[in-house]
């Protein structure tokens, strides 16, 4: 497999001299094409800062981040915008769908901006909608959808451009247990069947158990790493809980 993401000794500081907070402390790791990686850690551990640096929402203080061999820490504003649009897909906790557009139009928007022809857009939207089980809601507006439906539409929007990587920030945070399970099964489907590379930040061990590998962040450093291997999801969940306990608490309020 080829390396999609290479994080090389990155550090991130906030504040000014005399009052500096180190949010990320010399983190390095790689993500291979087709991996589903979860990131967990206590509140304030640096996990969201890490995702923000990878997504170019924030900038690193030092170190390098390569996506498909390109050092994104060196990109200028115009190139950054193109990189975000074409190389990354985003799934947010609050969906970020446009209320005035239907599900179909929300999913297709990025392709429209990229000037993909209408026939190709129609083909790709319907293929992904079928894969995620949302064909019946393509004509609905966000206010007509449940939270789970909105998040699956957001997932379709994230994958529609065939990005190098999908970044998900607490994707189940606003969902009930049934909708959460449906979304996680959708992400699992994107990973297994469409070979999407996914990096997901979550505080929840159940959510994390759908990933194939977990990075645990503590005090801005990688504290531990788990690889699912041949474990069932339940077995992997139990291993995750063991690490959560080592981090100093239970699944409900520490991560």
Where are these regions (language model features)?
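The feature captures the beta-strand-to-loop junction immediately N-terminal to the Walker
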Residues: 40-42
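Short coil-to-helix segment of the ABC ATPase nucleotide-binding domain corresponding to the Q-loop/switch region
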Residues: 101-109
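Conserved ABC ATPase signature
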Residues: 141-145, 149-151
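A short, proline-enriched helix->beta-strand linker immediately N-terminal to the Walker B motif
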Residues: 160-164
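Catalytic Walker B motif of ABC-type/P-loop ATPase nucleotide-binding domains
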Residues: 166-169
């Amino acid at each position: 497999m080829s390396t999609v993401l290479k994080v090389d000794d990155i550090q991130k500081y906030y504040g000014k001299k005399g009052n500096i907070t180190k949010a990320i402390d010399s983190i390095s790791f790689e993500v291979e094409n087709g991996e589903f990686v979860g990131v967990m850690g206590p509140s304030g551990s640096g996990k969201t800062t890490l995702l923000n640096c990878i997504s170019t929402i924030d900038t690193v203080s030092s170190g390098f981040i390569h996506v498909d061999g390109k050092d994104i820490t060196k990109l200028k504003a115009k190139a950054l915008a193109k990189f975000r649009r074409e190389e990354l897909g985003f799934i947010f906790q609050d969906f970020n769908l446009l209320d005035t557009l239907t599900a179909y139009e929300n999913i297709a928007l990025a392709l429209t901006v990229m000037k993909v022809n209408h026939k190709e857009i129609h083909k790709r939207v319907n293929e992904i909608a079928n894969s995620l089980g949302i064909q019946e809601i393509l004509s609905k507006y966000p206010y007509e959808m449940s939270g789970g439906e909105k998040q699956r539409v957001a997932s379709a929007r994230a994958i529609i451009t065939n990005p190098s990587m999908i970044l998900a920030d607490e994707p189940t945070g606003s969902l009930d247990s049934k909708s959460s399970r449906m979304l996680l099964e959708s992400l699992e489907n994107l990973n297994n069947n469409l070979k999407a590379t996914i990096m997901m930040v979550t505080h929840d061990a159940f959510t994390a158990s759908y990933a194939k590998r977990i990075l645990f962040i503590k005090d801005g450093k990688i504290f531990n790493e788990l690889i699912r291997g041949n474990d069932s999801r339940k077995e992997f969940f139990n291993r995750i809980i063991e690490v959560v306990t080592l981090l100093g608490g239970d699944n409900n309020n520490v991560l």
